[in-house]
Amino acid sequence: MGLFDFSVKELHDKLVKKEISPFDLVSESFNRIESVEDKVGSFITLNKEAAFGVAEELGDAGIDPNNMLAGLPIGIKDNIVTKSLRTTAASKILENFDPIYDATVVSKLKNAQTINIGKLNMDEFAMGSSTETSYFHKTHNPWDLSRVPGGSSGGSASAVAAGEVLFSLGSDTGGSIRQPAAFCGVVGMKPTYGRVSRFGLIAFASSLDQIGPITKNVEDNAYLLEAISGLDANDSTSINQPVERFSDSLTGDIKGLRIGVPKEYLGEGVDPGVKQAVLDALKTLEKLGATWDEVSLPHSEYGVASYYILASSEASSNLSRFDGVRYGYRSPNATTLEELYTKTRSEGFGDEVKRRIMLGTYALSSGYYDAYYKKAQQARTLIKQDFVNVFENYDVIIGPSSPTTAFKIDGMINDPITMYSNDILTVPINLAGVPAISVPCGFSDGLPVGLQIIGNYFEESLLYKVAHAFEQETTFHKEKPNL
């Protein structure tokens, strides 16, 4: 049994009693990376020397019994800036970017005395659902190396599933935590928009982006969200909501819970194996005293279309800062200012990023703004209202995290429309801004299936309670890939 088979709480107790040391945990992490990283490719940059240095300092000082995460190894998605540790967003244009400050979540993790093992691979600028658009390399799913780990936080999910780190941070703009968590058989939480500061997150779509935790089990996830949540003066969209002790909600008691199951989430396009795993999960929840009804989120069909208009529009604005002038890649072939812009961006961005910048620029252009961007915003309002309506009568909404299990590497990369359509069950949650968690709920042909539990605004505690109750009745979260 490896050290990462223990939970956060178990490892904390061992550290406090000095049965193990932070140095042991960091060694476990790097030994595992040495063993499997060539197969999975979870990381872009390793932080080995600094990680061992922090581990030794913490070991000498002793672990604070009240600091649950102290001494535990974490991986951080490479679009979250880390002071003096290369942060690339998996793009050539930021290949050698060395940030001069920490993201708020990184500062919070340092205060919690976690140990940063390194920066995790992702789709370039978080644009993708497979971690195939990374400038550096593709990441492979630990359950089947011929398949994708999901995206855009593919490295964050694969590193946890492969046992390279105990837990990780990802970001979720349209499903980028929940879908890879589902594909890799781990737990991923997309918090309410504004629950976690975005300061230091390299922006893709500012009205949709949210940082969240990826872990092996629900309890660990709750501890990690506690550590990174809270109001931040540096982020005007962070919300002044008390930081709850999410771990206190894990009572196992969900008697009387009212579940809404959208007919749109189990209809055409959902793999039979995925649908069956979700229906079996609902039976488990019924045994625990919950009830469920079929409900409707009638405007879900507009989710993907409106999401890709809005996200691409915001990206076209956010990514205009990468021009070769102040930081990042600069084309050596430019002789005029105009060439500096065009060549730097043409050479520095990958195909998917350029596709979305062009789509967003088109949607915002004067002749098409009303037809596309304005209409997408109107659809977003309707989608948001759908959730408000259902939550008047139900406590949570449940469906699959993804309509399929992990697909083959190179299977969709040249078919962007099919790839985009795969986000159909996750993007409405980001458009509405509500929280959702993906937990392992079974297997289909040997590949993990994720159960998506969606809550009302700032009801992460309830999501953790439901997810934990389900987890305690099943063993899916204990299954590990054979690497």
UniProtKB/Swiss-Prot annotation:
It catalyses: L-glutamyl-tRNA(Gln) + L-glutamine + ATP + H2O = L-glutaminyl-tRNA(Gln) + L-glutamate + ADP + phosphate + H(+). GO terms for molecular function: ATP binding; glutaminyl-tRNA synthase (glutamine-hydrolyzing) activity. This is Glutamyl-tRNA(Gln) amidotransferase subunit A. The active site is at 77 (charge relay system), 152 (charge relay system), 176 (acyl-ester intermediate). PROSITE patterns: AMIDASES. PANTHER family: GLUTAMYL-TRNA(GLN) AMIDOTRANSFERASE SUBUNIT A, TRANSAMIDASE. Allows the formation of correctly charged Gln-tRNA(Gln) through the transamidation of misacylated Glu-tRNA(Gln) in organisms which lack glutaminyl-tRNA synthetase. The reaction takes place in the presence of glutamine and ATP through an activated gamma-phospho-Glu-tRNA(Gln). One of its GO terms (cellular component) is glutamyl-tRNA(Gln) amidotransferase complex. Heterotrimer of A, B and C subunits.
